[in-house]
Amino acid sequence: MLIHPQFDPVAIHLGPLAIRWYGLMYLAGFIMFLWFGRLRIRQPHVAARGWTTRDLDDMLFFGVLGVILGGRLGYVLFYKPSYYLSHPMEIFKVWEGGMAFHGGFLGVVVAMWLFGRLRRRHWMEVTDFIAPMIPCGLAAGRIGNFINGELWGRATDLPWGMIFPQAGDNIPRHPSQLYQFAGEGVALFVILWLFARKPRPMGAVSGVFLIGYGAFRFAAEFAREPDNFLGLLALKLSMGQWLSLPMILAGIAMVIWAYRRQPGAGAPQPAA
């Protein structure tokens, strides 16, 4: 049995300014996105499509806005709509926590669609480009969750079960944040990076991301404690699982569509 180390959520104190670990993890995710993005631009089939470091920097700006706005609105709408309906001003207090990946994902899709319109690229060409780097941010975010001692798992008697004092019950639990780090972060990154090393039909890389994330998240939710204000929903599945199922189905549909359409695996596509 292990005990959560109880990290101080504030990593650095600079006078009245407190820099939190969770914010540093977001920063680490953005840095890894840029670093691996520059490596991706050097791949011959990617360079042939005219991607530049300026595109990458601009995509990060659009993506950050999509993550923050979509993640916050997703949390409000998917998890606590009644609370925020009664306390609308609380929606703007992003620094107090409360982000949802599925909302952030939708926000990024919209942001990449807008970016594609500005660059005259099809939105799926844009999402195909960024998909292999997204797990970097997911991995960093899950480490942030672990440092904060939040989003802990369900009770377990396994040797690596961990007591999270914030849970308030002194029961060993799955360190589900680390499971998600390993699945949604490390494993998904490896799968996507290897898959995207060769030219693929437009939409295929994005589809594999949807399938991979949805599957890893769906599996991890069996070890993660359901949100106490929601519990388990129909068929004893969590909200995270119900939101992941459409992602898996959409990903399968995109991969099938991409390979049936076969526009020429590496050919640039017109803007939509």
Swiss-Prot record:
Belongs to the Lgt family. GO terms for biological process: lipoprotein biosynthetic process. Its main location: membrane. It comes from the Bacteria. This is Phosphatidylglycerol--prolipoprotein diacylglyceryl transferase. Catalyzes the transfer of the diacylglyceryl group from phosphatidylglycerol to the sulfhydryl group of the N-terminal cysteine of a prolipoprotein, the first step in the formation of mature lipoproteins. It is found in: Cell inner membrane. GO terms for cellular component: plasma membrane.
